[in-house]
Every structure is written in C-alpha cells, then in structure tokens.
Amino acid sequence: MRRLAPLAAVVALGLVGCGDSDGGSSESEQQTGPTGESSSPEPSSTSPAASTWSPAPLATEGVAFDQKLHDELMAMFRRDQAGQTGGIDNEGPDARIERLKEIIAEHGWPTFDLVGKDGGDAAWIIAQHADLDPDFQAAALELLTEAAEAGQASWGNVAYLEDRVAAGNGERQTYGTQIGCVRGKAKLATPLTQPDRVDELRAKAGLDPLDVYLAELDKICAREQKRGR
C-alpha cells in the first residue's frame, strides 16, 4: 500500500493536537492545535473575505513542466516543514497561503504535469496547513478533488484534506486521518462518518488500514507525551 508521507511527517498531516483527558474526541469537543492549545479556526486577515481571488481553470492539455514553479513550491514546502517541527520559518503560513492563491489564480491547481508529483504534494501540504484560512482550505479541497479526478493529484491527499476541513468544522471525518493525542495514545479528532467502511474507503484512496495508521500515530503520541507536549 502506498504511504502518503514518511512517518516523521505524519504529525504535520494528521495529528491535530495532544491532550490530557481520557477517551477519544467527540463532536462537541473543541479541536486542538499542534501544540495542544485551543485552535478553533478564525479567518485570518488574508482570508478570501479580505483578499478576493479567483482560481484559473484546471489545465490538463498541453501543459509543460515548470521547473521554476516546481522549485518554488518545494522551497515553500521545506519552510512549512521547518515551522511544523519547531524550526525556523521566517516566511510564515499566511505568506505561503497568499502565494499559493497567486499560483492557483495564474495556473489553476498545480498539477502533476505542471510541477511534478512532489510539487503537487507541496501545494497540497500548504493547503492542508491553512487552518486559519478555512475558506481557502475548503476551496482548495474542491480544486484538489477536480485535479484528482483528472489524474493530476493524489486521492490520498484529497482524503487528508477532506478530513482536515471536516474536523476543522467539528464534523465527522470520512477516512480517520485527523488524530489527537490523549495520554500518549492516538484518538480520532472527530468521529467517523462510516466506521464499518473506513478501511474500504481508505483503500480506495491508497491509504493503509486505520489500525495500521493509528499504531504509527501511537508511537508519535507516546514520544510527544515523554517530551511533555
């Protein structure tokens, strides 16, 4: 089964918070951020409500690989990962979101043909972490889904972003990708839409079974607990 990202990167993709309470998350519980603080998303000053933007149509024919744009997205990805793992991020997520909006307005969603698979994954990760701009995050999900339907984006990425948007709204998630840490154990950030079908749906998106994923996240949550986070 294809793995969406190395284990070290899973925290940034699906781990939404750590806590001290017993039991899993419920629909009424407030989502927590990467460091455990309350983080119910509030639109930032750079949200679509404050700065209008319009995506270009998805380009699927006659698209030439853009090395410069690929390299720019990969550099944005590296800065994102530095910020997610406690490193130096002088750019900040708002600037990356605004730049991704500009890219989408000019090119449409960055497709595999345009920027390669790693460049497309980089664009998705920036959208995945746009929690303080939920309107953009939801719009990015629509664009990413359209690209996946055209074979120009990963269905695994769609699954993660779909769950991220749902969990951010306090809604049930489909694939169980969004997780919180509770006493050193991985717990679903919000309940599942179809618990009996989750592994079937995950398989269609190219993801490992949920118990395998949770076992990996358990290791990360245990490490975070030892660090006192």
Please place each PLM-identified region on the residue numbering:
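Mature extracellular/secreted ectodomains of secretory-pathway proteins
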Residues: K101-R172
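N-terminal low-complexity, Pro/Thr/Ser-rich intrinsically disordered segments
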Residues: G33-R78
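N-terminal secretory signal peptides
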Residues: G62-T111
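Bacterial N-terminal signal peptides that target proteins for export
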Residues: M1-L7
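Stable alpha-helical elements in mature extracytoplasmic
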Residues: R96-R99, A122, F136-A140, N157, ...
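Short, low-complexity, disordered segments immediately C-terminal to signal peptides
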Residues: A8-V10, G17-S47
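Amphipathic alpha-helical packing elements
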Residues: E162-D163, L188-I220
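Solvent-exposed, acidic/flexible segments
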Residues: G86-I97, V115-G119, D133-Q137, P191-P195
